[in-house]
Amino acid sequence: MAQQNFLVEGVSGTGKSSVCRELRSRGLFAVDGDNELAYRGDPYTGEPTEAFGHEYHVWDAARVREIAARPEPELAFFCGGSRNFSMFLDVFAEVFVLTVDASTLARRLAEREPDDWGGTVEQREQILRLHATQEDVPAGTLIDATRPLAEVVDAIVTLATSDAG
């Protein structure tokens, strides 16, 4: 296994993809799970489905485990949201949950393109409801993602490297 694997989670609009890009720009190994691991599947079985919706956004659990089992790099960050996280949560040393207040989330979602997740009124309403309930987010260390991106990533890297040491 990589010396330490970390999951960066949070509801849509909290900054998971931005964190992933920033980690990569710093030369750290980061997987954009929503683009590299995701497919439409049953969150309990992992079986592919034609069904569409938030609840069917799952990651390839075998691929997560495969990447996490690599001996290199020293630190590996998996960024994104998955409805089947319980199928692979055990490979992570820690889960970092990005949090923002409702007004920041609403502003970020309003800036999305109509074809991006959260770009329609219905999707924004669902995301704001999920933000209020946190029902699809694993427990973890809360990271205030209303701060500038560099500060958010600094906090994650500091916590990850203190855990790895």
PLM region spans:
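Hydrophobic anchor at the beta1->P-loop junction of P-loop NTPases
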Residues: 8
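Conserved substrate/cofactor phosphate-moiety recognition/catalytic segment
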Residues: 21-65
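Conserved phosphate-donor/acceptor-positioning beta-strand/loop module used by diverse small-molecule
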Residues: 91-111
